[in-house]
Amino acid sequence: MVRITKVHTGIGDRGTTVHLNGETVSKGDDRLEVVGCIDELNCLIGIVRMELKRMPETTLDGGPRTTVLAAQREFDKTLSHLQQEMFDLGAECSTTPDSIPDGMQVLSAESCERLVNEMDEWLEEVEPLSSFILPSGNPIV
């Protein structure tokens, strides 16, 4: 578990930041942009998890909403795991392959393959799409 003791550097903003490997780079650095995109994705996954937990678990007559319960049960664990992997990937992108610290979690080919397999399994349960769907109607989409 990472322990963060402060959230500022104390030296002000000079348009640069320091990667995990100690390298000072411009805040316009491509790797930093990638880390920011990964962080935003991680935040969105967190919002999906929150919205899943906020969905009513019972119908108006008090019966269970089995689809919601199943989604909460199955997806929260998967999304939690994915969030941790995205956090690890962001850290990995904050350094170079030759300067990855000992013991640092890196995203493995097996992790990527597992995610692809999970997505394929989820797609087996839905009807094929005939067009793109615009996200709307519910905060979770």
Set out the residue ranges of the language-model regions.
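Phosphate/pyrophosphate-binding loop motifs in nucleotide- or prenyl diphosphate-using proteins
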Residues: 1-141
